[in-house]
């Protein structure tokens, strides 16, 4: 898809307005305590912009995957004094407290997102209200009919005048809060986080500084078929790691021991290698591996001499020669996009490949102006763990959304926003 720039929060008249902001506060919780507040902090610039301009904020988010209830069931529960769809592990109440501390001002928590008209009507400029988890209602979901989503969006739309989307992580969802509200209000703009995501993906998918390398890893070829197919039209180099590399190696006739392999995808691997050759895209596969006989961490795993993996062994990371080759390739490029780890990085003996990629991208960005983009999910976690995330050009907050963009799909939560004026 070609990503067009969208109307920015900077172009909106916010003074005296009640501004509905769809944020992504889907933070990790441990017994009600937030273990990583990165997503909350990422939303602060948009919230502060509204408050500085003399508006008030009504914030909407999901957290986790609660079961949820229908609006009809919610009405009954609400009239009986209950909180519709409530699940302790998915409540946004701890987020309201954390947000209040970060903003240094009170944040009012509305315990039922569809029964908050009273709370919202009492708001003055400078006030912030956080609605309870929108997924406590099933109508938020993209699997519901348009009419059902619309019914929920109508109620939420009545709380505000202006709609801002700052939740790139759910931009691939056609849901009540992502697409329903802007359609009803007739306006929709991107917050700063959404704007940054669109800007970087537009660059890498449009006209990036060249050469451009894609580093693709993860377990299954089947999860990345569309991504590989789409990116092959845009890149100069493709580095493949993770368990998916062994399907490609087997397709080339190498022995892969007991490493993971998708037999049904061998033909696809061969055709992709041929397509790359025709398009003069250089696909680089691992030339050595870090192996063991079982899927567990050991002090001295076997490092192979070449591409072949011995019988009875499984590869769990790329080897030192491969690391050197991949790092050299990244060093030759002016743009890099990374999606998926090189090995089982959660286990220390098999983390070197993934962390070496993170380091090469961080150093390239910091020292040579490389445009580096991390496509969310496991790659973002690995970049954080390696300490290199802060040196990258952009670490995406949306695993699923960034994957769909790289596959060439359009994102409903982006296309619904107004075009830049």
UniProtKB/Swiss-Prot annotation:
Task: Report the GO terms under cellular component.
Answer: cytosol
Q: Which PANTHER family match?
A: PHOSPHOGLYCERATE KINASE, PHOSPHOGLYCERATE KINASE 1, CHLOROPLASTIC-RELATED
Keywords on record: ATP-binding, Cytoplasm, Glycolysis, Kinase, Magnesium, Metal-binding, Nucleotide-binding, Transferase
Q: In which pathway does it act?
A: Carbohydrate degradation; glycolysis; pyruvate from D-glyceraldehyde 3-phosphate: step 2/5
**UniProt xrefs under SUPFAM superfamilies:** Phosphoglycerate kinase
Record-listed AMP binding positions:
219-220, 224, 243, 315, 346
List positions binding CDP.
Answer: 218, 223, 242, 340, 345
**Where does this polypeptide localize?**
Cytoplasm
Main location (coarse class): cytoplasm
Q: Which organism is it from?
A: Trypanosoma brucei brucei
Query: Which cofactors does this gene product need?
Result: Mg(2+)
Q: Where does ATP bind?
A: 219, 224, 243, 315, 346, 378-379
Q: Which CDD domains match?
A: Phosphoglycerate_kinase
Question: Where along this sequence does the record place binding of (2R)-3-phosphoglycerate?
Answer: 23-26, 39, 61-62, 64-65, 135, 172-173, 220
Q: Which GO terms describe its biological process?
A: gluconeogenesis; glycolytic process
Q: Under which name does UniProt file this protein? A: Phosphoglycerate kinase, cytosolic
What's its top-level EC category?
transferase
What's the subunit arrangement here? Monomer.
- The record lists the membrane-crossing segments as none
């Amino acid at each position: 898809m070609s990503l067009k720039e969208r109307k920015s929060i900077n172009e909106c008249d916010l003074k005296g307005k009640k501004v509905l902001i769809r944020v992504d506060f889907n933070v990790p919780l441990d017994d009600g305590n937030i273990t990583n507040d990165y997503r909350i902090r990422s939303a602060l610039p948009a919230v502060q912009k509204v408050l500085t301009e003399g508006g008030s904020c009504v914030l909407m988010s999901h957290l986790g995957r609660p079961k949820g209830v229908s609006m009809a069931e919610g009405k009954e529960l609400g009239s009986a004094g209950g909180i519709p769809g409530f699940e302790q592990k998915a409540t946004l109440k701890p987020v309201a407290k954390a947000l209040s501390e970060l903003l240094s001002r009170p944040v009012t928590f509305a315990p039922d997102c569809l029964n908050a008209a009273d709370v919202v009507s009492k708001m003055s400029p400078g006030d912030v209200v956080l609605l309870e988890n929108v997924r406590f209602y099933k109508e938020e979901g993209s699997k519901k009919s348009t009419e059902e989503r619309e019914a929920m969006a109508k109620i939420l739309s009545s709380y505000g005048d202006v709609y801002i989307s700052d939740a790139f992580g759910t931009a691939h969802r056609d849901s009540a809060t992502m697409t329903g509200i802007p359609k009803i209000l007739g306006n929709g703009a991107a917050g700063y986080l959404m704007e940054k995501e669109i800007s970087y993906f537009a660059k890498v998918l449009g006209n990036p500084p060249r050469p451009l390398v894609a580093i693709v890893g993860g377990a299954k070829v089947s999860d990345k078929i569309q991504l590989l197919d789409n990116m092959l039209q845009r890149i100069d180099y493709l580095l493949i790691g993770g368990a998916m590399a062994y399907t490609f190696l087997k397709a080339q006739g190498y022995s892969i021991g007991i490493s993971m392999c998708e037999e049904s995808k061998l033909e696809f691997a061969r055709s992709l290698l041929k397509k790359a050759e025709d398009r003069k895209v250089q696909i680089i596969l691992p030339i050595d591996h870090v192996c063991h006989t079982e899927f567990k961490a050991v002090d001295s795993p076997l490092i192979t001499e070449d591409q072949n993996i011995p019988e009875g062994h499984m590869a769990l990371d790329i080897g030192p020669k491969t690391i050197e080759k991949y790092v050299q390739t990244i060093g030759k490029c002016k743009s890099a996009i990374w999606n998926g780890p090189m090995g089982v990085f959660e286990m220390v003996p098999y983390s070197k490949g993934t962390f070496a990629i993170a380091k090469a991208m961080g150093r390239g960005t910091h020292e040579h102006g490389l445009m580096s983009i991390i496509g969310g999910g496991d790659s973002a976690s690995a970049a954080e763990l390696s300490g290199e995330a802060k040196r990258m050009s952009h670490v995406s907050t949306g695993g699923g959304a960034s994957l769909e963009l790289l596959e060439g799909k359009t994102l409903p939560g982006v296309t619904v926003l107004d075009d830049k004026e």
